[in-house]
Structures are given as structure tokens and as C-alpha cells.
Amino acid sequence: MILGEIMEVLAFKNQSLIDHVNDMVKYWERIKYRYLKTIKRALEALNIKLDIEKVDEFMKILIKLHDIGKASKIYQRAIINDQEKLMGFRHELVSAYYTYHILLKKFGDKNLAFIGALTVMLHHEPIIMGQIRNLKKKELTAEVVLDKLKKFDGMIEDFEDLIKKLIGYSIGDIIKNDSNKDDIIRFVIEMSVRARHTPNSEKLRFIVGTLLLPLVMCDYKGAESREGKAPKFAEVLEVESYVI
């Protein structure tokens, strides 16, 4: 389902979050039959069994929520006003927090929610890992998480309405509407530790990699209508979508 206009929450300076999500969903509808069975088999590696319709629903939730962290006050201030700075803030860490809780509510499976949230958290992996290396760290440590979220000061006033339009749930029925920064920091640190030290870490990386390809493809395709220079990944996108 393509979403109607809600409010002017921006994903990019020249594209609203809703328009970005709509374009991503449209592109997913074009390519999904190439990926649904592969994703289904990948999830089965961790004994997560979903039928094709549920896999489709799962992926659409990732698409709709992957940038929900951009509905944070700090991000909207920075994108509207060039004088405002993000100060290292990474929206995907906030997106992962909400994605986990919404997936858990929707599917009732902690492992599936974790995988989905981790995928969302890593959908800009080259950026965040590059920033970590600049801090002379090798991984998403507590210190790094604190640095990336230190300026986070909550979500926009109409966040609950935005979530309800995107996924049909009231966020107040799932978690606190204006989650405490400490809650998000604690969650991201726990995710990072679990991802590195789980006994099934190799399977986990395989599954997340399987999910990241179509998610990132849709993300870049969904940004095509914005003004500005096309991202380099667009070259990969053209190869992947050539026969569609």
C-alpha cells in the first residue's frame, strides 16, 4: 500500500520521508519476487519460518521504518537549517530501536525483530563504520554509541501520527512515545554485543546481508527523485535492476 501525504517530515533536503518511503515501496513491488524466496530460506537458517506473504510484510516494515530516526528533532532541525549540525548523530540507530519493538509487536518473535533491527541499523554501514574508524575504534562500542546519540533530544511532536500512518499501530501501544535517550543507547549497545558474540554470528551475518541488498537497493531507488548528485551505489543498482 502506498502511503498518502501526512506531514512534511524530510528524509532529504528536497524529499519528504513519506515520498521516500512511497518510492521505495513501489520499487520493492517491482523486484520483490526476485528476493522473497531467498529471504525466506535465509531466515530458516535460524529456524524462523515465515510464509511468502509474511516475508513480504516483514520487508515492507523494514522499508517503512529504516529512516524513521530521521523524524528526530535533531535531524529535522539540521536538514531545514544549514546552521544546525548533526554532531555525529546517526539516525539509523534510532530507527533500529523502533523497528525492533514494532516487529516484536507485529510478529511476536524476538529473533526476527533483532534481525530486522540489525539490518536497519546497518543500512548505512560504510558511513557508520567509517566514522568508527575515525574514532580509532573497531566496533560499535558503548563509547561510540554514546558519541552518535549524545545530541539526540527526542522525536518530533507528531511522531505518533507518523508511525500510525506508516505501520497501522499507535506507538503508545508498543513503547513510550518519547523514548528516553538512555533507553535507545542501552538497546543499541545490547544489539551490538549480541551481534558480535552470538553463537550463530556467521548465520546472522548471512541473513542480514541477504536483507541488506534489497533494502539498500530500494533506499537508493527511493532517493532518485531528490535533487542532487546520484549516489555511487546507483551504478550497482542499475546492474541489479537491468532485467526487471
From Swiss-Prot:
| Consequence of changing D219A | Loss of all nuclease activity
Instruction: Please state how the activity of this protein depends on pH.
Output: Optimum pH is 7-9, varying somewhat depending on the substrate.
Q: How is its activity regulated?
A: Both ssDNase and ssRNase are inhibited by EDTA.
EC no. given is 3.1.-.-
Documented effect of changing D67E: Very little nuclease activity
Q: Which residues form the HD Cas3-type domain?
A: 10-221
Q: Which GO terms describe its biological process?
A: defense response to virus
Q: Name one Pfam family in it.
A: Cas3_HD
Q: Which cofactors are reported in the record for this sequence?
A: Mg(2+)
List of residues binding Mg(2+)? D67, H91, H123, H124
Q: Which residues form a coiled coil?
A: none
Q: Which UniProt keywords apply?
A: Antiviral defense, Endonuclease, Exonuclease, Hydrolase, Magnesium, Metal-binding, Nuclease
Comment field on protein domains? Proteins of this family have an N-terminal nuclease domain and a C-terminal helicase/ATPase domain. In some CRISPR/Cas systems the domains are swapped, in others they are encoded separately.
Q: How does it assemble?
A: Monomer.
Q: Which family does it belong to?
A: Belongs to the CRISPR-associated nuclease Cas3-HD family.
Q: What protein name does the entry list?
A: CRISPR-associated endonuclease Cas3-HD
Organism equals: Methanocaldococcus jannaschii (strain ATCC 43067 / DSM 2661 / JAL-1 / JCM 10045 / NBRC 100440)
